[in-house]
């Protein structure tokens, strides 16, 4: 089993910075939403960031080495998790930072695949091991993170039951869906599915499966696909689902969808802040870092 987790936190947070259509946020919360990376917004007890809770679950799942991919202006991460670029101790987790630099001629970062490629270039040891990858603005359960560690499949992703997601239907309908075979091996990922698509994409349990960007990768075989990832024609970014599908085409039957049926709290827009705060207060009333259980 591997013990490295790469956390994607270098994005532009464009949707979070849009004007809120809710009036239940304080001026401080609005300011943080406009200025901070999403995972650093203070939604937890004593104003601690969402990322604390993700790291807490990662520790419960027995990860040891955490690589946080930050943007070029990511100094605030170091105030929370360690001042050095690598090997900071945060409650027993070894925290290192990779920087996603913006290419010349672009204004925004070049996408999740570019972020991971820059990280493995800065930490090449990842290319000779297995590792997990996830977002910084989602709160994945310790059980889901542990499942990525424990699977024997070279590559994997958490394959969530779409109906278990506690989001508005309009939002859920925008999620890309995964097509799996009878053994839960990934065959395809479909963006913007129609109602007709949904029926033929049901898995062996009759469920519609979605990815929330929680992956396990074989660094050795993934590297070439990260390096050669094409740019998405609509979004003008290099994206991890593209890398995953290209890897599957070259290495079929090596990427399993691990079925999970649970909600994944998500900080995408200002409207999510109050809901995530309520969720954390209910399910994570106290983070006692000295007690893993």
Predicted region positions:
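Conserved N-terminal catalytic core of the sugar/cofactor nucleotidyltransferase
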Residues: 1-7, 13-31, 44-129
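Conserved alpha/beta core of the MobA/IspD/sugar-nucleotide pyrophosphorylase nucleotidyltransferase superfamily
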Residues: 5, 189-293
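Structural beta-sheet core signal
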Residues: 5-7, 68, 133, 157-158, ...
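Hydrophobic packing residues within well-ordered alpha-helices of enzyme cores
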Residues: 16, 77-81, 148, 226, ...
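A structural signal for short hydrophobic beta-strand segments in well-ordered beta-sheet cores
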Residues: 40, 177-180, 257
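Phosphate- and divalent-cation-binding pockets in alpha/beta enzyme and binding domains
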Residues: 76-79, 143, 243, 275
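Conserved beta-loop-beta/alpha segment of the NTase-like Rossmann-fold superfamily
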Residues: 92-177
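Conserved core of the sugar-phosphate nucleotidyltransferase
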Residues: 139-224
């Amino acid at each position: 089993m591997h013990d490295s987790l790469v956390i994607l936190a270098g994005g532009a947070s464009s949707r979070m910075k849009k004007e809120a259509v809710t009036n239940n946020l304080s001026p401080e919360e609005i300011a943080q939403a406009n200025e901070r990376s999403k995972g650093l917004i203070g939604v937890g007890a004593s104003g601690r960031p969402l990322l604390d809770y993700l790291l807490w679950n990662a520790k419960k799942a027995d990860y040891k080495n955490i690589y946080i991919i930050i943007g070029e202006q990511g100094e605030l991460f170091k105030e929370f998790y360690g001042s050095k670029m690598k090997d900071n101790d945060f409650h027993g987790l070894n925290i290192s930072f990779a920087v996603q630099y913006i290419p010349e001629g672009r204004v925004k970062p070049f996408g999740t695949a570019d972020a991971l490629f820059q990280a493995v270039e800065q930490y090449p040891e990842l290319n000779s091991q297995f590792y997990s990858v996830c977002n910084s603005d989602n709160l994945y359960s310790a059980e889901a993170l542990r499942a990525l560690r424990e699977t024997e499949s070279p590559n994997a992703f958490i394959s969530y039951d779409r109906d278990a997601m506690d989001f508005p239907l309009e939002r859920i309908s925008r999620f890309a869906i995964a097509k799996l075979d009878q053994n839960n091996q990934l065959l395809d990922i479909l963006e913007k599915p129609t109602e007709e698509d949904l029926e033929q994409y049901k898995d062996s349990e009759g469920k519609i499966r979605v990815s929330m960007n929680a992956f396990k990768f074989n660094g050795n075989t993934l590297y070439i696909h990260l390096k050669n990832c094409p740019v998405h024609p609509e979004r003008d970014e290099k994206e991890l689902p593209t890398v995953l599908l290209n890897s599957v085409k070259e290495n079929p039957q090596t990427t399993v969808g691990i079925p999970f049926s649970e909600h994944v709290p998500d900080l995408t827009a200002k409207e999510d802040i109050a809901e995530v705060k309520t969720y954390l207060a209910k399910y994570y009333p106290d983070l006692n870092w000295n007690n893993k259980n």
